[in-house]
Swiss-Prot record:
Keyword entries, A-Z: Mitochondrion, Transit peptide
NCBIfam families cross-referenced by the UniProt entry: ygfZ_signature
PANTHER family per record: TRANSFERASE CAF17, MITOCHONDRIAL-RELATED
UniProt-listed InterPro entries: TrmE/GcvT_dom1, YgfZ/GcvT, YgfZ/GcvT_CS
Protein name: Iron-sulfur cluster assembly factor IBA57 homolog, mitochondrial
Gene3D superfamilies assigned: Probable tRNA modification gtpase trme, domain 1 (3.30.1360.120)
Gene, per the UniProt record: CAF17
Length: 406
């Protein structure tokens, strides 16, 4: 069964008045971050298996935007998929008028920040490559709202950085340099923090690992992030599992993109979703979902490659693709999959064409690499809780966890 995740933020704030001086946005994330020499040295000495199982990593590919003002909550409420009246951190998305994702975001808000500012305020965490576009989007809708909207430095005395932790590493983050924390609602065992920029680590007696291990964690759990994995203005929020990540409040009022989102919820049919996948080159049989992660796996499938069924000889069929590669590191990755064609899950009354034992693959430089979708128990549990046929929408796993804490 799925692990229950807790959404209660680690609410710690000891900062002085936020410096709202604008700075240049950092470079777009390319899948790997370049760490200082000392940290790269640690990475070369650390066990790959250990780093995959548990670790902390800075996320230089994420930027922060500061939003504050007497009507900031009302303003943001009309632009995002979640309830912006909250006073604890949450996951959400900005949509365009057609209901397509502009960007996925974390909204960092906590009581101490609001008290410090004297009104509702937050940090909007977004893919660094989309920060400027999001700034323009916010200013375009500002109208007569009295708001402060500014980039947040990632360096210097007043800078703030985004960090991630996974496995047991979060137990080492003990009120030591972090500003706020959140148990990542997108998947079990993932955690997120804001920390002062001058911190080289957020965990006592624990050094950071390369950011690619954070990406591996996301891929293992099937968590897409940022513009490379959610192409702006074309990705639907349900296809990116934003609904299953507690990123959509289906009961909230009007916001941009709501019409298609609610219509999809009422029809109850989402035929494609991003799932974790494992790769296997050569030999008979499907890829083993329990096989160790191998970052050096080759040949490496590339984003955009079509996934097709394999015939009895192991060759790719010439029919309609059943999916498409979204991202990959080694033998793990993400793929947009036609649910009823590539898994045993059903999303419609008529069902799909999936048969037990069906195998899938991609062509990488003339070689067939097998692709195995991975469907976690917790993923199925979330999907059935939210989209189960004939059921009323149940309380989210986040709401249940919060009630237990209260």
């Amino acid at each position: 069964m799925a692990s229950r995740i807790l959404a209660a933020p680690v609410q710690r704030c000891r900062r002085s008045q936020h410096d709202r001086r604008p700075i240049a946005v950092s470079a777009t994330h390319n899948g790997f971050s370049r760490l200082p020499t000392a940290l790269r040295s640690y990475f070369t000495e650390a066990s790959t298996a250990q780093a995959i199982a548990s670790g902390i990593a800075p996320l230089p590919h994420r930027s922060l935007i500061f939003l504050s003002g007497p009507t900031a909550s009302k303003f943001l409420h009309g632009l995002i998929t979640h309830d912006a009246t909250r006073v604890s951190p949450f996951y959400a998305a900005f949509l365009d008028a057609r209901g397509r994702v502009i960007c996925d975001v974390f909204i960092w808000v906590w009581p101490e920040l609001i008290a410090q500012q004297g009104h509702w305020a937050c940090y909007i965490e977004v893919d660094a490559g989309q920060a400027n576009a999001l700034m323009l989007h916010l200013k375009r809708h500002k109208l007569r709202h009295k708001l402060t909207i500014s980039h947040v430095p990632a360096e210097g005395r007043d800078g703030i950085k985004v960090w991630a932790a996974w496995g047991d590493a979060h137990k080492q983050v003990k009120d030591w340099g972090e500003i706020a924390g959140l148990q990542d609602p997108r998947a079990p065992g993932m955690y997120r923090y804001l920390a002062n920029a001058d911190r080289e680590t957020i965990a006592r007696d624990m050094q950071p690992v390369d950011t690619k291990f954070y990406d591996i964690q996301r891929y293992i759990h099937g968590v897409p992030e940022g513009s490379a994995e959610m192409p702006p203005y074309s990705t639907l929020p349900m296809e990116a599992n934003i609904d299953l990540s507690s990123g959509i409040d289906f009961k909230k009022g009007c916001y941009i993109g709501q019409e298609l989102t609610i219509r999809t919820k009422h029809t109850g049919v989402v035929r494609k979703r991003i799932l974790p996948v494992r790769f296997h080159a050569g030999g008979a049989g499907a890829a083993d979902p329990q096989a160790p992660v191998n970052p050096s796996f080759a040949p490496q499938p590339q984003p955009g490659m079509d996934i097709r069924t394999l015939d009895d000889t192991g060759a790719l069929s010439k029919g309609r693709p059943t999916g498409r590669i979204v991202a990959a590191i080694g033998n793990v990755g993400l793929a947009t999959c036609r649910i009823e064609n590539m898994t045993s899950m059903r999303v419609s009354t008529e069902g799909g064409f999936y048969k037990e034992g069906t195998q899938f693959g991609v062509d990488v430089d003339g070689q067939v690499v097998r692709v195995e979708p991975v469907v976690h128990d917790w993923f199925v549990e979330r999907k059935e809780a939210l989209w189960g046929r004939g059921e009323k929408m149940k309380k989210s796993w986040v709401e249940k966890a919060q009630e237990e804490l209260d």
